[in-house]
């Protein structure tokens, strides 16, 4: 299994989303992180499970939350480039590829 590495911009996406959900309801941010952990484990176990959506970048959708994990697979690692809401402008994450 390849390691899953999260780029700093993607880590900032995740932290911002976690904090926003925590302000909406106590514990909801933790639920978001758990859904993210589940998706990252699935990506690590089978990175080709999710479809390529742009120039070798794949997207895994989170359960229960309207977010996608955008990642690229390389020979030695899987790199997460973004974790964004599905309705965001795709150019925002595409500029990170």
Go through the PLM ranges and name each one.
Residues 1-33:
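Arg/Lys-rich, positively charged N-terminal/basic patches that mediate binding to nucleic acids
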Residues 38, 45-77:
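Basic/aromatic recognition patch in beta-strand/loop cores that engages polyanionic ligands
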Residues 68, 72-97:
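Enriched for short, Lys/Arg-rich terminal
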Residues 30, 51-53, 91-93:
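Short, hydrophobic secondary-structure boundary micro-motifs
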